[in-house]
């Protein structure tokens, strides 16, 4: 029969030494299904010199291979002799690659680290969120939860079409732990909430239900509802790791995929994979957005207008709320609202990111945690494969390049009104396309008909179009028809990609050439803006901030520049007010009182909540009132309250995610000392845990006085002056560039005290 299938994801397994590829799909009747490919074999390429037959014989002696074929392929644009080496299973490629790399006559090995399912999707140009038409046979195979199972006979065509209605849910759960560092062996899940198109479902701890039953009911719900997409808001890849470890400790398997027996497991990019379903980490999507400083669910949902601002509960306080039966409904409602926000946020992001999935070819769950560099490279591999270009193996590259400093004016520190932000990232894209800069056009010898960089004299062939130019032109053509923000972001990120030293096609010459040529054009553009009556107050690699003149005049100038230099400059944002503190350190107020903060708060994750909040309020006050004195009063008021004991202990806790083994950390870091104290007292603190600590009074260095937060019950034990110093130090990072001295900020008089109580009078 001939049927059409909408692709969700790919996976594979080995049966009887035969790799089976599963194309998880929705068929043209709306059924969840799996299409099984039985005939595709893993392979890689070897570039050789000398006697090909002898080399083939040596490969066969060293490796268990299925087939070796002599082929012609391209490497960096040049046709080369190569061997296509097929193996029986994907795992044999790595073993074979290591053995044959030492054989005489073998120059290089290519395509050997491309995932098996990605190789298949590239060769047949199958991309998630697109359709394919195929000859298939419906079969009854055990081991699947999909409604239909098909054996693939032949792919007939592939095309883009309407996305079918996908079943999606948002998930949130809360954990009971009195000691902050969550231990899946002992800390139960007290409430688990789900939200879907049909509404809510919640399971919670009570006399009739322990968390073993919660987990079982959760598994049953997923299997019965059968979602195509599961949305999570998974900071530090925490949720799935915890729930799987908790389930294992209770003797339960989280077997919720469409392949029976395939448990939730960690995949290629660090995400947790669920067979046949897309497990999408929304934090991963948001953290890869430029200028997105929010990773808090409530803040980002409010910022995007998805759900209103609401109160947040600290995860380490859940046990306190749960112990008070009057507050249990508060925890339940909080978790339910989280699940709803996650579901709505997921659907909000689905539309733009589905476009990116089609272009890059990564399933949405993998794309959600892949960096922009990995996204670009996945797409570049597809472009290269179309022209039979060999794919280099990724490896560490010590041959670093240094970027040319492209900030062509010193930032004008201060507070500004009505600032236009111009996106100039098209300068780099234009340079790459205009000068055909690419690894396969780079000429290291003599060349009489090449483009040449301005400083280092790097040469690039004018014809044919290189890999990078071809890739960017393909994206540009797509963008012309779809006007997608995420495609635009993908193109803008290409500059960072060419400077990524661990990319497959990294070249110091290319990175330097793009820097040299784009610097010259960027300087001409900025000079033209300044000479047209606008004031340039900040310019970095991607953005130029200008003020003065009308919007119409600026649009006319942009049109002129784009025509003159073949660029695509555009106004990205308009700030009602803008605070500039240095290179790439700024904050802006948009319409609707939305605030962007860039780099000012980059180091804030190592601060306690109170200091972070005061620092943000200082920035907000400056942007809204443009009154530095009010911001100073805000800091002084916070200091007074801190010294008066008007705070919650939880506000002073500093939280750290432990990403490595303790042996890899400096022993004198406060969180390491606090964690060791907790371990010595019998608490489980390990890699991937979170530790919260407080600095207490006493003698010795600060790190020696770091205590796990659950050791500190009274406020009078806390070293308040440590936190006052931290508050002042962080506030001065914002206020000092605006003319506020440390001495004046520390000085507190009677007026400051009266201001705190609203008792001083303005005259």
From Swiss-Prot:
It holds the Pfam family DNA_pol_B_exo1. It catalyses: DNA(n) + a 2'-deoxyribonucleoside 5'-triphosphate = DNA(n+1) + diphosphate. This is DNA polymerase 3. Belongs to the DNA polymerase type-B family. One of its GO terms (molecular function) is DNA-directed DNA polymerase activity. SMART domains: POLBc. CDD domains: DNA_polB_B3_exo. Its EC number is 2.7.7.7. The keyword Transferase applies. Keywords: DNA replication, DNA-binding, DNA-directed DNA polymerase, Nucleotidyltransferase, Transferase. The lineage of its organism: Archaea, Thermoproteota, Thermoprotei, Sulfolobales, Sulfolobaceae. GO terms for biological process: DNA-templated DNA replication. InterPro entries: DNA-dir_DNA_pol_B, DNA-dir_DNA_pol_B_exonuc, DNA-dir_DNA_pol_B_multi_dom, DNA/RNA_pol_sf, DNA_pol_B_thumb, DNA_pol_palm_dom_sf, DNA_pol_type-B, RNaseH-like_sf.
């Amino acid at each position: 029969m001939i049927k059409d299938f909408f692709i969700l994801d790919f996976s594979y397994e080995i049966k009887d030494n035969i790799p089976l590829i599963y194309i998880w799909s929705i068929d043209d009747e709306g059924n969840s299904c799996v299409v099984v490919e039985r005939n595709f074999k893993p392979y890689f390429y070897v570039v050789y010199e000398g006697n090909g037959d002898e080399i083939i014989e040596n490969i066969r002696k060293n490796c268990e291979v299925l087939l070796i074929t002599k082929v012609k392929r391209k490497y960096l644009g040049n046709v080369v002799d190569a061997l296509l080496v097929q193996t029986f299973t994907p795992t044999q490629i790595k073993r074979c690659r290591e053995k044959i790399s030492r054989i005489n006559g073998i120059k290089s090995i290519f395509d050997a680290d491309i995932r098996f399912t990605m190789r298949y999707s590239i060769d047949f140009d199958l991309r998630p969120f697109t359709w394919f038409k195929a000859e298939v046979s419906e079969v009854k195979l055990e081991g699947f939860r999909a409604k239909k199972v098909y054996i693939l006979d032949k792919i007939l065509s592939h095309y883009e079409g309407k996305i079918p209605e996908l079943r999606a849910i948002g998930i949130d759960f809360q954990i009971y732990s009195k000691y902050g560092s969550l231990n899946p062996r002992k800390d139960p899940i007290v409430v688990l909430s789900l939200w879907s198109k049909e509404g809510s479902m919640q399971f919670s701890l009570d006399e009739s239900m322990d968390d073993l039953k919660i987990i079982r009911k959760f598994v049953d719900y997923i299997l019965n509802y059968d979602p195509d997409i599961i949305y999570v808001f998974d900071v530090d890849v925490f949720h799935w790791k915890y729930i799987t470890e908790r389930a294992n400790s209770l003797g339960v398997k989280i077997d919720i995929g469409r392949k029976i027996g395939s448990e939730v497991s960690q995949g290629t990019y660090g995400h947790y994979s669920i067979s046949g379903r897309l497990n999408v980490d929304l934090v991963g999507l948001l953290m890869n957005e430029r200028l997105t400083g929010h990773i808090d669910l409530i803040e980002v949902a409010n910022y995007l207008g998805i759900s209103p601002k609401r109160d947040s509960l600290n995860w380490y306080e859940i046990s306190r709320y749960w112990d008070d039966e009057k507050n249990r409904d508060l925890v339940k409602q909080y978790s339910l609202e989280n699940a709803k926000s996650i579901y709505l946020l997921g659907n909000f992001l689905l539309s733009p990111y589905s476009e990116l999935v089609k272009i890059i070819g990564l399933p949405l769950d993998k794309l959600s945690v892949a960096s922009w560099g990995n996204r670009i490279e996945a797409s570049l591999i597809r472009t290269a494969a179309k022209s039979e270009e060999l794919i280099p193996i990724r490896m560490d590259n010590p041959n670093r390049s240094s970027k040319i400093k492209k900030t062509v004016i010193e930032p004008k520190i201060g507070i500004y009104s009505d600032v236009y932000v111009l996106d100039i990232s098209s300068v780099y894209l234009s340079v790459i396309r205009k000068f055909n800069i690419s690894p396969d056009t780079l000429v290291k010898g003599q060349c009489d008909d090449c483009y040449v960089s301005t400083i280092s004299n790097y040469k690039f062939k004018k014809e044919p179009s290189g890999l990078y130019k071809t890739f960017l032109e393909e994206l540009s053509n797509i963008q012309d028809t779809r006007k997608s923000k995420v495609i635009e972001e993908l193109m803008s990120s290409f500059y960072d990609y060419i400077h990524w030293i661990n990319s497959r096609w990294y070249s110091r010459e290319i990175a330097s050439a793009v820097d040299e040529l784009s610097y010259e054009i960027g300087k001409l553009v900025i000079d033209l803006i300044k000479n047209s009556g606008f004031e340039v107050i900040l310019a970095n690699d991607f953005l130029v901030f200008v003020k003065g003149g009308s919007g119409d005049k600026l649009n006319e100038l942009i049109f002129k520049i784009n025509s003159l230099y073949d660029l695509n400059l555009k106004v990205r944002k308009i700030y009602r007010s803008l605070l500039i503190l240095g290179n790439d350190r700024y904050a802006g107020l948009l319409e609707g009182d939305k605030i962007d903060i860039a780099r000012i708060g980059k180091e804030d994750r190592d601060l306690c909540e109170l200091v972070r909040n005061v620092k943000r309020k200082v920035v907000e006050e400056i942007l809204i009132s443009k009154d530095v004195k009010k911001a100073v009063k805000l800091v002084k008021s916070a200091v007074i309250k801190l010294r008066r004991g008007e705070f919650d202990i939880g506000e002073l806790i500093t939280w750290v995610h432990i990403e490595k083994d303790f042996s890899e950390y400096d022993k004198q870091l406060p969180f390491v000392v606090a964690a060791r104290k907790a371990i010595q007292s019998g608490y489980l603190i390990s890699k991937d845990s979170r530790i919260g600590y407080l600095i207490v009074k006493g003698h010795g260095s600060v790190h020696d006085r770091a205590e796990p937060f659950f050791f500190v019950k009274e406020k009078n034990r806390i070293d308040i002056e440590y936190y006052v110093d931290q508050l002042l130090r962080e506030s001065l990072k914002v206020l000092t560039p605006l003319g506020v001295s440390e001495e004046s900020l520390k000085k507190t008089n009677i007026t400051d005290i009266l201001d705190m109580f609203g008792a001083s009078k303005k005259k």
